[in-house]
Amino acid sequence: MYPFNRTTSIHAESASQHIDELDDDDFGRSNGKFYSNRHSQMDSDVVAHQVPPGSPVEKTILASILEMSTINDMWVKTFTAPGANKKDKKRRESLFECSWRGVHCVSNSLRSILFLFRLLAIFPATTDRKSRRKRNHRSIIKLILYVNYIVLAVLLNSFLIKMNFKVLMLYKHKFGLMHTGTVASMITATKPVINVFVIVLSAIKFKSHQRLLKTIDMVDVCFRSAFGVSPPLRIYKFVFFFTLLIIFFSALILKVVEFVGTGEIFGEHILTDCSFILVPVLSLWNIIPLLYYHLYNILVRFYCRTLIKSMNREHKKRHFSLKFYYEQFTRITNVQEAVGDVFNPLLLFSLAWSLLVLCLTLYFLSEPTSTLLVPITPEQVTNPKIREKLNITVHVKICWAAYQVVMAILHIIIICSTGMMTNETTRQIVNAVLRIVPDANADLDRFQISCFVHKMTTQFMWGMTVWRAFPLERTTFFTLISVIVTYSLLLFRFKDDMVQNPPYMAAMAVFNTSAVPTPAPG
């Protein structure tokens, strides 16, 4: 399953003479301990196919993987002993086999992030789950409770959608559709709609999410065994949670400003009291899928760069065969395909609502009657105190709408940029393959190179795309930017014509009136 075959076998006698020439790649890590290929023996069946009998050889990566995959008898006896507790048995039956053996894997490092997801009822997953045949009544009860928790989160966001719709219709009835308060309410009302879609989609993609975690765990184990490296997940998690804290406290500060500016009092309404926690959580629901998608793209790019660095060192000394590199490249493409299976519908929906919010904002700003300074005029509300309070309320809604517009811009930029960088980094692997000097068996090398090239031609099937509608490339990003800029320039041009050329607009109004056919007298 893991044909990590060296191109040459180094004998033990010659290893001591050239010890200074060995790279750091000759070292690995197994169960938390360093091992050296110079001080180990291969399995008998592997030796028979690699070197003549009786030759002392170093331990290959295949033998190391087989050793890691072999369960320690001492631990097995401990877990299967009659006196073993339930925690040990549950640990032994873990979904990800390498997690309970102490081997590093991505799913174990992401436990804190997955726990946060379970609290927010999105992307349900667990790294310690029994098989379906061995589920007991306790696990079934937990599953039922979690499903109810997801339904409760959907109902909460549905209630917020209903309340926002009532406020939207109230502003539309009093001030019109293109009023500042109406447009701001429409923009802020997209937040619970997005949350409902994210919660429902993550529940539907439960199996795909589990498959993604298992796939990236397998790639991580292979790369740790072959190259002795692993992604700096502690740094990635720190950046992830630090970004969430910024989003959380920015929404909380804006809510406190709204509470003080509008003169609200604690205890008047339970929804107002709960909004100090509810509003920041709504913002987290919006941003977490984007950050999670970005995290997986960072991991994929890390494995791609590791493979490229190893290929670039092949000019000095051949360590691995092209078949080995192709197998690792295939594993990376499997991770990208699994990422797309989980996030593709979410990417399409995120780009859709982001463009909708931006276009609605630009259309509102291009209206000649739109004003942000005095949204409630004396002609609309004659009472000065009520008008002042309404102006403050609408200005707060403008701030929330601007907050959502910033989120929309971040979604467009991050989705396009991270997908573009992942696709370009993946293509650099083929460039590194083409720079490798062919070995003695040139025909086999040519075949492996053709496999690389053919696999890369099908990148639209497994690469970073938007539900295979279009790939995430530089052209995609610049196309979206050009569409938004062109739309805004046209709208603002029409606004200038309507303001600076009233006779023209009056003539157009007369022309439109005369163009309407008058009904014949009965």
Swiss-Prot record:
Gene that encodes it: egl-47
Membrane topology according to the record: Multi-pass membrane protein
Protein's UniProt name: Probable G-protein coupled receptor egl-47
Transmembrane segments: 140-160, 184-204, 238-258, 276-296, 345-365, 398-418, 472-492
GO cellular component terms, A-Z: axon; dendrite; membrane; neuronal cell body
Alphabetized GO MF terms: G protein-coupled receptor activity
UniProt-listed GO biological process terms: egg-laying behavior; G protein-coupled receptor signaling pathway; sensory perception of taste
Deletion consequences: Similar number of unlaid eggs as wild-type animals.
UniProt keyword annotations, A-Z: Membrane, Receptor, Transmembrane, Transmembrane helix
UniProt subcellular location: Membrane
Expressing tissues: Expressed in some neurons in the head, the HSN neurons and the PVQ interneurons of the tail.
Summary of the function given for this chain in its UniProt record: Orphan receptor. Regulates egg-laying probably by activating guanine nucleotide-binding protein goa-1, in the hermaphrodite-specific neurons (HSNs).
Native source species: Caenorhabditis elegans
Similarity comment: family membership: Belongs to the G-protein coupled receptor family.
